[in-house]
Amino acid sequence: MRTNFARLAMLAMALMLVLSACGSAPAATQAPAVATEAPAMTEAPAATAAPAATEVPAATAAPADSGMQIPEVVDGKTNVAMVLIGPHDDGGWSQAHYEGLLYVEKNVPNVHVTYIENVPEGADSEQVFRSLARKGFNVIFGTSFGYMDPMEAVAAEFPDSTFIHISGYKTNGTNFGNLFGAMEDMKYLAGMVAGSRAKTDGNPKLGYMATFPIPEELRLGNAFILGARKTCPDCTMDVRWINTWHDPIAEKDGAASLFDAGADVVLTGADTPAVADVAQEKGKWGITYDYIGSCKVERCLTTIYWNWGPIYTKVINAIVDGSYKPGFDYFDADSGSLGLFGFMDGQTMTKGTADLPAEDIKMVKDTLAQMLAGKFTRFDVFKGPIKDNKGNVVLAAGVSLEQLDLDQFKEWNPDVKIGMYWWAEGVTAELPKLSQ
């Protein structure tokens, strides 16, 4: 799930150590509150339980230039820090990463883990990354698109620390790597579910509540409508831009706007389950994102979720044994780190999904099985023939987008051949204006 926009927080910061109810969770440092917020397996990944109690080091004052306190490292251990854009218990993006960190604490030998939450993108985050590196953290994860440039800058200053950026598209090949997953796989499947629901309800209008106009959001929105039109060829999709990753009020307002404009099903690209709560109030349907536990109300069709623990464990173990090579690591559904709730092994479909036409459910399951087997990837999601919503041919029959097309806009990078600055056929919204 993230993009660099204007600072949204006050300069005052406070320290908070968060302890898990079933043990001692990673130490957490509280950054300023902000209104913001970047993977299938045969067995469904379950929400990760907190590890057995371990010692949590007390946080100490950060260097004067950071304006906040930074946790201490533990001598003799592999020290891992994670920087979160939102609160660790947001019910979405940040909570999925936090539970991945708990998995690491339980499964990586001799590791010390900690996290800092609510860190704004931009200059504030650069100070946090620099302070963590100065403290001596061996591995530092940054979990928002807008941390990309700050992490790149700090990585150049601290060659003995390894920086892993989630989402984005930059790497230095030495100590700054990139990690993300093809959530377009799952959003394509979620589109099939949404299209089937809309068709069954007799209302072929869908909605997508998008965050920021970055390639990730257009990629995921396009995957959703492409999937929807497999089960509902007449379906259309409206879009609302809320310009935040994490703001429950803005998310509720955006969802309500789409429902009030006629949408039967709305998918969110933001962090919290707000879209499902609004769907419950209005008797419509919502699809949540990021976290396996976010689909709780009756009017939630499904959620597309990440299972970060195994991926994080693999990366940290590789760093420790010296085999990690910083680069661009982009995984598909066969990694075991992406899920579609209700369709993975051992899971039960929601009420709103279970009564859909049998042929549509079969299409979703068959496509998912191909994804899990590695036979259907992100390049199959974006394989022609595909037209944009103006009737122009984006991809001829049999032609797929390349990775660079998925990651960037042609308007931002002249090396991109096609890019993602287009809406697929069926989208009724105009393209967003791009910031430079």
Where are these regions (language model features)?
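Bacterial N-terminal signal peptides that target proteins for export
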Residues: M1-A9
